Regions:
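Structured catalytic-domain cores with a bias toward divalent-metal coordination
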Residues: 1-337
């Protein structure tokens, strides 16, 4: 049966708030799985995907086909959801500490008695997930193709996940000094020498506006098929061959806005661009033709993400694109602040 294992953490005002979570215990000794969405509380697509996936998992359990134990956390961040300001949810950063909700998980997990609501929430999520053999953390970018972040130690075994989700790109990383949730899983498993046969991945489900029944149904089916292929569900998964691109994180190019202004894209998502090709421009002072700043591809590659706002601040990420060689600008760590 579906077990409610919801957690309670304190909000920034000191009031208890729930982290809704459910667990289905399988009967066949299959892998333990943790699925969550909404660590960045303004990234909505994964919430709807898990909302649609949970009844399918429950039916598999009723039918006796669930072999593994699956934990589902469709909306993982009650702190971020509470940050509605002027009609928008400020879901990426914790207002009280200015910390990115998907950073510092390693630090928080190591604390015996977390002193802040932020750290206590992070530790609770890690404790809920760390015993799983498969951990999928669902996110979205601003505007994006579907893509994955995967530690290199899981590659190429994670090609089945990339194929199931029809991911355009798998970004392979080696070291996570910033403490993303996925990185906290990997760090713990490596420390305990439990990495064999496991998988943790950050799944980027396109852009923040890509929320619909059609997309959520497709993604829920993709994750279901992946779980079938991994032996979590006793059902044929119809694995898809993956035709995407695996790129080391250091080969990704991030183009930042050199000035503030009106952002105009000249190439679409998914476009293959040549080194030096125009990809966008920023009109710093509308009405002044001399204020246009042209942005060019630092190297040849494919446009994977772009900013959805068309009025951009200096220093914001404009686009990210794949590269075939190390980026001259990458110094380690994650691609976004």
């Amino acid at each position: 049966m579906l077990e409610d294992i919801s957690l309670t953490v304190n909000s920034d005002s000191g009031q208890p708030v729930p982290v809704r979570a459910w667990r289905l215990a399988g009967q066949g000794g299959g892998p333990r799985v943790h699925l969550q969405a909404g660590v960045h509380a303004d990234e909505i697509a994964g919430m709807l995907v898990l909302h649609k996936l949970l009844p399918r998992l429950e039916q598999a359990h009723v039918d006796g086909r669930l072999r593994g134990t699956v934990t589902v956390v469709p909306q993982a961040n009650p702190l971020g959801i509470a940050q509605f300001r002027n009609g928008h949810v400020l879901g990426r950063f914790h207002e009280a500490t200015s910390r990115n909700f998907n950073r510092h998980f390693n630090e928080s997990a190591a604390l015996q008695r977390p002193a802040t609501t932020f750290a206590a929430w992070q530790k609770a999520l890690v404790d809920l997930a760390v015993d799983a053999r498969i951990v999928l953390d669902l996110h979205t970018d601003s505007e994006a193709l579907p893509y994955l972040y995967v530690n290199r130690c899981f590659w190429p075994d994670a090609r089945d996940l990339a194929g199931a989700l029809d991911a355009s790109v798998a970004i392979l990383w080696d070291n996570d000094d910033d403490g993303a949730f996925e990185g906290a899983m990997v760090s713990h498993w490596l420390r305990e020498k439990q990495i064999e046969g496991r998988l943790a991945a950050t799944v980027e489900l396109r852009g923040q506006s890509d929320v619909s029944d059609a997309l959520a149904d497709r993604d829920a089916q993709s994750i279901y098929a992946f779980l079938c292929g991994r032996g979590v569900i006793a059902e044929r998964g119809d694995p898809r061959a993956w035709s995407g691109e695996a790129v080391p994180m250091g080969h990704m190019e991030t183009v930042f806005a050199p000035v503030s202004g009106v952002l105009v894209y000249e190439r679409e998502l998914g476009a293959q661009v040549a080194e030096g090709e125009r990809i966008a421009r920023i009109v710093a002072r509308p009405g002044d033709p001399s204020s246009e700043h042209v942005l060019r591809a630092p190297q040849a590659g494919r446009l994977v993400t772009r900013c959805r706002d068309r009025l951009i601040a200096q220093g914001d990420v404009v686009v990210k694109l794949t590269g075939s060689k190390p980026s001259a600008n990458w110094t380690g760590g994650v691609l976004d602040p």
